[in-house]
Structures are given as C-alpha cells and as structure tokens.
C-alpha cells in the first residue's frame, strides 16, 4: 500500500472509516467478523483507522480497541475524535472543552482503545470561538505524549488559522467527494499552504458513487441514508449523469466506479487521505485497490471539468442527520 503524509504522520494512502461497524449504516457485522475485516485491511496495507467517541456513544471506540488489540501498536495509526459537548453519561460541570473536560474524554478513549496514546486526536464538529484555547490544550497533550498529533473536523478557514498559529494542526477531517466539493475553494488549498493533511470522509458520497445502490433500495431504520437527501429516489435519478460519467471512466481504466471516485479524491491533492467505510471483504479489496488506480493530469482535468457541468441534487446535512435520532442535538454540520 502506498503511503501519504498528514504533516509528519505517515499513513496508508487509503484509510478505513470504522463508524459503520457499530453506527449509522443499519445492522452491523457481528463483532468477531468486524474484527476479522479490520485485520484483513491491515494485512493489505491499511494502517489508518478512524473512529470517534460519539459513534454509538463509545461503542465504536471499544470495537476499534478490540480490533487492534492483536495488531502491532507501532504499525497502527488511530484517528479518534472528541465531541465538543458532554455525551450521555458524562458529567462535566467545567465544560467539555475545558482542559479537564478534554483530558477526561481522552482518558476514557485511551482506556477503550487499550493504549497509552492516540496518534491523531480531532475536535469533532468544531465549536465556535474557542479555537486557540483548544489548540493550546492539544499542545500540552502532545508534549505529554498522550497524543501524537491533533486535528479539526469541518472547520472554517479562520478557525484553522487561529488554531494552527497556537499548535500546528496535522489534519483537517471533512466530507469530500465528487458530490461534495465545497472544501476545494479554500480549506484544501489552505491545507497545502500550511502543510496540513486533509482526511476525506464519505469519499464515495456514502456509497452512491459505488454504483451499487438503486433508487428503489430500502434501508434499516437506523441507517443514515434514510435522511441524506441525495438518496431520495428522485435525487438519485437526477444524479444519474454523475454516475454515468464515473462509470465511463471506470470502463476506460478497467476498474470499478468506486475506485474511480477514490482515485479522483487522491488526485486532487497529495495530502488528501480518503477513509471509506468498508464492511465486506470484497469492498476492502476494491477500495484499497483504488490506491493503485492513477488518473493522469489530463484525465483528472477532463473528469473534473465534466463534473463541473453537472448539478448535484441532495446532500448530507447535519440538520437532516439529527432526524435519525442517533447523534447529539447539537449537530449542525
């Protein structure tokens, strides 16, 4: 597996988004099977595993801890995220983003992972107005060896600049795909200027760009795609030209639509690392194999130019996701 740099953190070119093993995508695989899938990804060269304390309220971290227990810790990169407000069961009168609150979150996560440090610790869904204070706390945790690096999730340019001036940021994590490109305008270029990596979640638009989902497909009641408007049957039909474009390039490159969508994300900038979810052995092989699919400069320009002419119908919005009832009320992105 090829590797990429998130600032000084070297990770596999494609990581594994672990959320779906316990959260947001309907019935999860049995724990034993899920652990086997994580091990399969690791054996194929994936060393970057992303989770968060908010996913299933700590259960996803517990799963990742069990999955990496028998893997060599020095070859595993744990990417974890802490929520900016107290989650159920947390008593934090001093505030979640105080130093005491962040330390309490971190200590809980370390215990669930069964480790004494986290490689990349990210503020999940950025709160407003406290960037410099959080950055200062992150700097202390790095010096103490509790975390190796820190990041922000879905921040503004101003939030990045303020925090980065206090403690250098290693990575920004935000949604990025052929169907969600708003970060191209300012955040991704800024990352390049400041030597900050960019971790792209939902790089295949929650599976739409895989070409394996039909407009008539139904989902379990706890599946996030029930509330993501791009999966509305009318929007799926309206977005068919995007999928046809991706399939055209997949045919030319002798690969799958999902691999083309990941290859496009990778080509956008050398410091972008996509973290698709993958809960089947064949998806792991397919998605990780996308690291070997290379678009030439001309192919990338042509594909991007064609995408620019197509309208995207529907999106993934925090206000819609709250309707699912599986995330805290303060989700706004």
PLM feature segments, named:
Residues 19-21, 54, 81-85, 123-126, ...:
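Active-site beta-loop-alpha junctions enriched in small/polar residues
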